């Protein structure tokens, strides 16, 4: 950027000298114009020649080169240099805007750690994070970036997660806490055991995601690419006809006059404003979203969010905290302690949130030697042998499948039924909590003209209905198996318009098929969840559903800016193209129609980055 700025300043100074000084020597004046042209336009002509040899003839470099060299041939030296000078000014604005757009992504790129302090004996050795292995012990001092994912084994501190989440409140870590690469250690010294190699760490996955985001083009960007492909050769052909035909068929018409018009026509026709500002708008939108702790994997997904009509939520871990707590224990023929002990052991190998809550409530160490023959039945529960007894833990479906009589009273919460050797021994009531901002999230989505908000859950109807009523959801589908969720999604697809989109929001853990099937898959709690980052199109780094509405606002703002630029740029260019063809405008007006429109469009695109009040 500095190099280009100096070229503009020096080129402008030489041009001003040639124009303002009344030089007696015409050849010296022409020489100054040529020197000025080489300074500001040499690289453009060079690129045009290179592209011609590559078979890429019709681009903005070609248009600028032909128009300006043509101006020199008909003696319009100041205009020829001015076109290149102002083209470079437009490019300068573009590089500045791209630089600013990249800053939020640069704040993400800043999360890449430069080194890791690896403990080797009594010494600390600074090494590249790529060289650190799983199981190595690293030390993170105050003010340093956490280089790799790990578990704290010594010390405590506050860590700044804002670069990943957009949240300013620091998080406390102590012995046993998981720490994530890319966060900053604020005060204490912590020692951690590395749990993932750098290539698989949170920071690497996020950086890879962001770097590849620009490769997925929105419909608006694809339209501009196709438009430029056909538009540029057409205007070159029109310019050639404009320069040759009128002087041959119109009495008194001169070639110099019509060539001048054709050159002005070429300058105006350059599609820079569109080619630059549209991708820049989406790039700015993606950068703005990252400021809010939301990673969008491509412009196509950002655009699709603006067209969303139906938002479907998974319940557990998305609208609710996913932290289940045992509320009640109701044994039949055994003690409460025995019921909980058998249940915790049977569920010990499951990674379901309910299993965690049962083990947490047991509060004792699980003796794995007592457990064998574990069978997890999806959507039903677990069957395991504990102390030689066949223990069945699950929902109503499991009890029905095993033909075991069970408690059928009305209860609010998740009921875990337990049987031993086909004899019912009681049930445990577990409840989840709704997240603080879930109701606000639904309210904001409805305010953003989302036609339907839907919740899918494997829980029973009473729990599903209670949560849906509390949050103000339009529909709820309960008692669903994982496969049923995809089926329900297919039903919901038929309820949206042809252009409308359906978004599914889940925690990214058990939702991969549904996230993949939706038009836009949104994963919550991406911070620390590899599955969320892998599976979704949009990753919300925190556990806040309200950020979905914020991301949609960013999406709509970005799309509005892109459409404004398309209408503005094409509209101005059509008007000035017609005026140029009729000889009503000069080359200077053509320069404004090209460079001026580009600068205005770039500055407008720049607004996509401003997400402070969204």
Q: In which residue ranges do the predicted regions lie?
A:
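Juxtamembrane helix-loop transition segments at the membrane interface in multi-pass membrane proteins
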Residues: 49-57, 96-106, 280-299, 606-614
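Conserved ATP-binding TGD loop and adjacent catalytic N/P-domain core of P-type ATPases
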Residues: 388, 420-564, 572
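Residue-level signature of catalytic and energy-coupling elements of molecular machines
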Residues: 48, 76, 97, 116, ...
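Conserved catalytic phosphorylation-site environment of P-type ATPases
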Residues: 61-65, 164, 260, 273-346, ...
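Actuator/coupling domain of P-type ATPases
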Residues: 19-21, 26, 33-119, 131-138, ...
């Amino acid at each position: 950027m500095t190099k280009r700025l100096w070229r503009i300043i020096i080129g402008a100074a030489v041009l001003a000298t040639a124009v303002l000084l009344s030089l007696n020597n015409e050849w010296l004046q022409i020489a100054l114009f040529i020197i000025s042209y080489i300074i500001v336009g040499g690289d453009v002509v060079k690129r045009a020649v290179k592209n011609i040899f590559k078979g890429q003839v019709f681009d903005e470099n070609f248009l600028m080169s032909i128009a300006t060299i043509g101006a020199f041939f008909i003696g319009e030296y100041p205009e020829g240099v001015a076109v290149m000078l102002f083209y470079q000014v437009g490019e300068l604005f573009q590089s500045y805007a791209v630089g600013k757009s990249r800053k939020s992504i640069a704040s993400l790129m800043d999360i890449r750690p430069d080194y890791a302090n690896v403990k080797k004996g009594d010494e600390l050795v600074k090494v590249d994070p790529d060289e650190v292995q799983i199981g190595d012990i690293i030390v993170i001092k105050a003010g340093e970036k956490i280089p790799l994912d790990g578990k704290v084994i010594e010390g405590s501190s506050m860590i700044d997660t804002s670069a990943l989440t957009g949240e300013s409140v620091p998080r406390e870590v102590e012995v046993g806490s998981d720490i994530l690469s890319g966060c900053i250690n604020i005060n204490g010294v912590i020692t951690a055991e590395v749990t993932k190699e750098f290539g698989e760490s949170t920071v690497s996955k996020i950086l890879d995601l962001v770097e590849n985001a620009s490769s997925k083009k929105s419909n608006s960007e694809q339209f501009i690419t196709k438009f430029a492909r056909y538009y540029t050769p057409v205007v070159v052909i029109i310019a050639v006809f404009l320069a040759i035909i009128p002087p041959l068929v119109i009495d008194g018409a001169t070639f110099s006059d019509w060539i001048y018009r054709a050159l002005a026509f070429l300058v105006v026709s350059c599609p820079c404003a569109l080619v630059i500002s549209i991708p820049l708008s989406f790039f700015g939108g993606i950068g703005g979203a990252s400021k809010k702790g939301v990673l969008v994997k491509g412009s196509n997904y950002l655009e699709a969010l603006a067209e969303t009509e139906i938002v479907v939520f998974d319940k557990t871990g998305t609208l609710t905290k996913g932290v289940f707590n045992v509320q009640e224990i109701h044994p039949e023929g055994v003690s409460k302690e025995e019921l909980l002990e058998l249940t915790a052991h049977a569920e010990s190998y499951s990674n379901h949130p309910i299993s965690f809550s049962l083990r947490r409530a047991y509060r004792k160490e699980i003796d794995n030697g007592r457990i064998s023959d574990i069978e997890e039945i999806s959507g039903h529960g677990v069957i395991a042998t504990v102390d030689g007894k066949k223990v069945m833990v699950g929902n109503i479906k499991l009890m029905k499948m095993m033909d075991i009589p069970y408690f059928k009273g009305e209860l609010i919460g998740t009921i875990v039924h337990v049987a031993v050797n086909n004899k019912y021994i009681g049930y445990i009531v577990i409840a989840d909590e709704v997240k603080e901002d879930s109701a606000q999230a639904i309210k904001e989505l409805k305010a953003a003209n989302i036609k339907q908000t839907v919740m899918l859950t494997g829980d029973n109807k009473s729990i599903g209905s209670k949560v849906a009523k509390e949050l103000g959801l339009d529909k709820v589908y309960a008692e669903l198996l994982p496969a049923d969720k995809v089926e329900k999604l297919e039903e919901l697809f038929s309820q949206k318009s042809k252009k409308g989109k359906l978004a599914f929001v889940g925690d990214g853990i058990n939702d991969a098929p549904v996230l993949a099937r939706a038009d836009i898959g949104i994963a919550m709690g991406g911070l620390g969840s590899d599955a969320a980052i892998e599976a979704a199109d949009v990753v919300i780094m925190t556990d806040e559903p309200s950020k979905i509405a914020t991301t949609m606002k960013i999406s709509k703002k970005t799309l509005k800016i892109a459409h404004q630029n398309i209408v503005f740029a094409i509209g101005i260019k059509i008007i000035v193209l017609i005026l140029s063809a009729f000889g009503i405008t000069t080359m200077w007006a053509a320069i404004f129609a090209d460079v001026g429109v580009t600068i205005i469009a770039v500055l407008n695109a720049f607004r996509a980055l401003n997400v402070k009040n969204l």
